[in-house]
């Protein structure tokens, strides 16, 4: 995403200052205050640390990408559509039980729609389903241990059933796939796996993973268009700020690979 945003210089000729915070809200607030001292014209926010209400108080054009954005403009993937596509494919492939693996996402976060769409689609088609939101951890190893625990539970709870596993991102999907290969030396016919994001790990996995692809280039372009419109308006003699935040959703693309029929 960052690469796509930075490449927009040739179109808009705006220079970028990039800050990455790792130590919470206080550090991020300090960074933003430093940025404001540089008299920046606008801000693109990808982190989830500060609420959109806090961000809106800075009184500069702001666009959020894939995060809570009640009080500021935003661009997101249509997470509901992506999860609907993934869930529908697993249903078409005649899985006996559908399982969604995720963290416990707050409802205000766009990615929550992946959970909502999975649940509503399973109910609509009257397909048995299981939602596991217990993934946690800050390191790769901690998360892998959680995925291993969930894999063991699924193996014990759903023997002799074809299992359709929809994971919230490609990293989780790759972990789950590797655990299957460690046990079975292959992807058995009673497992199907779908990830989300179309990150490089999905195509580079031991078996290329079916995934819901986010159109990162379009998301970045749309975010820049939204931000530039607001910044240009601010330069007018009598600027007219947005009456309310603008929220745009970009359609995802289901990319079928080797982990589904």
Spans of model-derived segments:
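Short, well-structured alpha-helical segments in soluble
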Residues: 25-39, 143-161
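An alpha-beta-alpha
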Residues: 86-132, 239-259
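Hydrophobic alpha-helical segments within soluble ligand-binding/sensing domains
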Residues: 71, 75-100, 116-120, 142-152, ...
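Short beta-strand elements in bilobed, periplasmic/extracellular small-molecule ligand-binding domains
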Residues: 9-20, 119-144
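Short, solvent-exposed amphipathic alpha-helices that sit
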Residues: 1-11, 82, 110-128, 175-179, ...
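Periplasmic-binding protein-like
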Residues: 32, 39-46, 99-102, 159-169, ...
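Flexible loop/turn connectors
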Residues: 152-164, 168-261
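Alpha-helical recognition/docking segments in bacterial nutrient-uptake
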Residues: 1-88
